[in-house]
Amino acid sequence: MSRIAALPDHLVNQIAAGEVVERPANALKEIVENSIDAGATAIEVELAGGGIRLIRVSDNGGGIHPDDIELALHRHATSKIKTLNDLEHVASMGFRGEGLASIASVSRLTLTSRQNDSSHATQVKAEDGKLSSPTAAAHPVGTTIEAAELFFNTPARRKFLKSENTEYAHCATMLERLALAHPHIAFSLKRDGKQVFKLPAQSLHERIAAIVGEDFQTASLGIDSGNGALRLYGAIAKPTFAKGKTDKQYCFVNHRFVRDKVMLHAVKQAYRDVLHNALTPAFVLFLDLPPEAVDVNVHPTKTEIRFRDSQQVHQLVFHTLNKALADTRANLTESVGNAGEVLHDITGVVSTPMPSENDSENLFDSVSNYPTGNKSDTHNAFGSSGKTAPMPYQSAYAPQQRSLSLRESRAAMNTYAELYKKTDDIDLELSRFEQARFGNMPSETPAPQTDTPLSDGIPSQSELPPLGFAIAQLLGIYILAQAEDSLLLIDMHAAAERVNYEKMKRQRQENGNLQSQRLLIPVTFAASHEECAALADYAETLAGFGLELSDMGGNTLAVRAVPAMLGKADVVSLAKDVLNELAQVGSSQTIEEHENRILATMSCHGSIRAGRRLTLPEMNALLRDMENTPRSNQCNHGRPTWVKLTLKELDALFLRGQ
């Protein structure tokens, strides 16, 4: 039987390197973090062969004392901590003393460093675990570390590396994260001798724009909130900017990039009311807290952490983001161009870009190449086969509702008119607005003479509602509205769904329960065993949602009361859907966690259905509701409620001004 023996230090370092240095990007991270801890204000990175052939990092930090330069390449040698108490309060990026030793054991490493009070630099080399004697060298104040031929002595590890392009991409991403976390430091990157980027010391606002992109910066909401010793700040993207990828998600804890389940779950919860399930939010979040409140000594790469009070962190992140998103209401800052990107992320269909003034020669080619779908897409919005032209992206936008009969439509016609008694004046305001906008155009009928100047009663641009005024209804699905220099298209079902949803949430928060309305004649329906069980378990909960059901026996349930604001909904479908939602509540989930989903389901049943014809006052009342409703840019499922076509974009379609 083999005897137990101590492993040689070089082998121990190579084993440790398997945890710390998985690929060139990890080696780059360890070296750059040392530069940050050294107080550098400028860091230059050069890569060759994707970081496999060479990683060179130069900084202008404090440097290493000549007597310590050999020790810097020994395992567990560090200047960051000396006691266990120091470890619990560590604020530096590195602290274990494993990084350089691990890199030196699997590469040909050269370390050159000079302190401010030294007349020359000191250089030491390491190859295959063997250190050379320190020698004098020429070097400015600071440190340069070169790691060449990574994994040259561990071919089994090297064969697991990807292509040079892939490894470079990982290195560039790693450096961008470090640059984003430390905007006060200038960063530069060269790849195979060519400059990739050069970032000066910047403000956080400027660094976010440089790394994440100007498009993110334009579509983001700034946040800055605190709770005791915790501070959360940064930027989160509006839901309309959401993508199908997670490449624009950054979480930093004490300026260290992390992948933390607590923070990510809080972000997901904050966006769940406004984001389509096929999309992911974009954000750059910085959480500052005392070092003793977080344990970073959990994973060799330090990307996983553990909070002392994770509930406090979750609440801070969720409430901060939820409040910022709730403050977003319908306005005229979104455009149909961004909606096309959203549709591409949801459906995978590439939309045709809006032509610019210089693209007139390609306009008709773009129209002819516009996606028309297959035969199955030629069904119209009412679910039957029609002769109308197929509508691109109909599957992404079409409300998943059956069309109403004429009798049902008439019965529900006055919903919004009852809520807004003064909407009769909207038609007059609209006509005045049109006169102001197009009053100089020739008219076949002379305008009547009046002693009152026309401008006295015309709303100015500042008085116009953000979503303008409705002018027509399209295909029983969309509302066309005219605003200043733009045409708006509103999905009436999606918009009404959000309005009803927020009203029910507000009523539930203020009163604890939704007001119910008893049915004159109870409606019975055949139920499944699961639905009957859900009623037995959650009858009291249903009452809180304004639903009163009773078990008639024989798997038959009766609906006796429904929420007052949903009085005209299909009560059977409403009851069955809510029961199904409740049936999904398991032992690890509570009603509170499902509450918004239940309210969203209920609001869907009480919203305007496809095929219902609205009057202008009803359409305008819905627009005013949207302007006063939080998160009204998206429906409960995260789909856009409206898009905008500017006058310039409309002119381009007709080659005006070409």
Curated annotation (Swiss-Prot):
InterPro entries: DNA_mismatch_repair_CS, DNA_mismatch_repair_MutL, DNA_mismatch_S5_2-like, HATPase_C_sf, MutL/Mlh/PMS, MutL/Mlh/Pms-like, MutL_C, MutL_C_dimsub. Residues 114-137, 437-456 are annotated as: Disordered. Keywords: DNA damage, DNA repair. One of its GO terms (cellular component) is mismatch repair complex. It comes from the Bacteria. GO terms for molecular function: ATP binding; ATP hydrolysis activity; ATP-dependent DNA damage sensor activity; mismatched DNA binding. It holds the Pfam family HATPase_c_3. GO terms for biological process: mismatch repair. Residues 442-456 have a biased composition (Polar residues). This protein is involved in the repair of mismatches in DNA. It is required for dam-dependent methyl-directed DNA mismatch repair. May act as a 'molecular matchmaker', a protein that promotes the formation of a stable complex between two or more DNA-binding proteins in an ATP-dependent manner without itself being part of a final effector complex. HAMAP family: DNA_mis_repair (MF_00149). Belongs to the DNA mismatch repair MutL/HexB family. This is DNA mismatch repair protein MutL.
